[in-house]
Each structure stands twice: as structure tokens, then as C-alpha cells.
């Protein structure tokens, strides 16, 4: 999944275009053939990384991308943010070693229930702490990964506060970044 976050402003500084937007590439699973709609083959992921390592691209941390949107800091044109949703175990097993090898920043969005319940196929809190300790940005994706547009305000508050409580206990702070499960939201 690829999206652009922007407020479309472009400035030229020293012949390098500076902009206040970045392209976000979102991944879910790596090397898990039985989930074709959310999986990327490892060979294909390596091809993505090879392309993104070319000088025409600028891989940035999500925090820098958000600063660009807020017009606090412009980023180079063709800046790319890598995000990974859902904290599947294949992230730690396959994607993390590749991203670490090339020192590429990324954000991992986590729903806390599947981690707390030790659901097979998901990362552990220990693995999430290892990523955090190595500079990976950890974001929230609620407690139970619900379809948020179906929730009332009390349910939304519950999902977010319980998730934040778990993050504080397990990694020492609540995430400053949030991703809507399924990309769905309501105006509450």
C-alpha cells in the first residue's frame, strides 16, 4: 500500500527540491505465502529496498515526515516513509534484519491485544522492545484492532486508553503516532 501525506509545498534549496510531503509505503507480512493480500515475498521486498536505496530516494523517519506536513521542517523531494502494520512475527524474522542491515528507519504499528494474548504469528513484547531499542518508531493501532467507524466515543476512548496503558507498562511510554485499523475512522 502506498500513499502520499502532503500539503503540497515545494521549495528549491541548493538545486535540491525540498517539499512538505512524503510517500508512505506500508507493509504487513513478509514471506508468508498463505496470506497473499497482505504479504510480500522476501525477494520482492529486497527489490523494493534496492530501489529505495538509489540516490533519487530519501528514506526518512515518520517523525520527520510529520514535521514536514506541519511545515516545521522541509524534506527532500522523493522522501519515503516505511511503515509496517500489525506486528506480525515475520516482521521481526525477515524484514527487521534487512532494514537494520541498511540502517533504514521504519515505524511499526501495534495493536496490544494480540501481543498480550501471545497469538501465534505475532511478535512478542520483548521483540518490540528490541526494535524500539534499535531506533524503530513504535506506533499504536489500538487495543483490539477494531473497525473504529463502528465505535462510539466511549468505546474509542477505551480502545486508545487501554492500549496506551499497555504500551506504558511494556515499553515505558505511550506512542506518539497512531494508525487507524483498516484505515477506517469516524468523526468521533
Segments and roles (model prediction):
Residues 1-3:
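Bacterial N-terminal signal peptides
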Residues 64, 83-88:
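Substrate-binding cleft of extracellular glycoside hydrolase catalytic domains
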Residues 6-80, 122:
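N-terminal pre-catalytic segment of deacetylase/amide-hydrolase enzymes
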Residues 20-32, 76-80, 88-187:
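Metal-dependent polysaccharide deacetylase catalytic core of the NodB/CE4 family, i.e.
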